[in-house]
């Protein structure tokens, strides 16, 4: 039986991991064992944070809408409920954009919400 030498394959695998760890600090970017652990952990962080990003942005949009609605003496929850009653279906991302960049349109949305709530 022929002897199997895996030097080329191992070297390629090590190179791949070191390439993925480029930019990491110290041994994490140079030593295969440490770099491999760092790459695995970074993959776990990436997976987790791709999910958290959705939550974080939704939180941000809600905070922005709440801050904008406070100027019109209305709470976020009442504003959203009023929009639902007046059957205006705009998602929170777009509402926050309108609140920042188009104050006049946002004021109209607040008025619709207040009318639906009869405030």
Swiss-Prot record:
The keyword RNA-binding applies. Keywords: Ribonucleoprotein, Ribosomal protein, RNA-binding, rRNA-binding. Gene3D superfamilies: 6.10.160.10, Ribosomal protein L20 (1.10.1900.20). GO terms for biological process: ribosomal large subunit assembly; translation. InterPro entries: Ribosomal_bL20, RIBOSOMAL_L20_CS, Ribosomal_protein_bL20_C. Belongs to the bacterial ribosomal protein bL20 family. This is Large ribosomal subunit protein bL20. It comes from Buchnera aphidicola subsp. Cinara cedri (strain Cc).
């Amino acid at each position: 039986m022929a002897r199997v030498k895996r030097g080329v394959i191992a070297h390629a695998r090590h190179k791949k991991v070191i390439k993925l760890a480029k930019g990491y600090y110290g041994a994490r970017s140079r030593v295969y064992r440490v770099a491999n652990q760092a790459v695995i952990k970074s993959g776990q962080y990436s997976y987790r944070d791709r999910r958290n990003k959705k939550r974080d942005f939704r939180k941000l949009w809600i905070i922005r809408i709440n801050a904008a609605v406070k100027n019109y003496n209305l709470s976020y929850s009442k504003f959203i409920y009023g929009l639902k009653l007046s059957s205006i279906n705009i998602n929170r991302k777009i509402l926050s954009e309108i609140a920042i960049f188009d104050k006049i349109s946002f004021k109209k949305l607040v008025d619709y919400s207040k009318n639906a709530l009869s405030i």
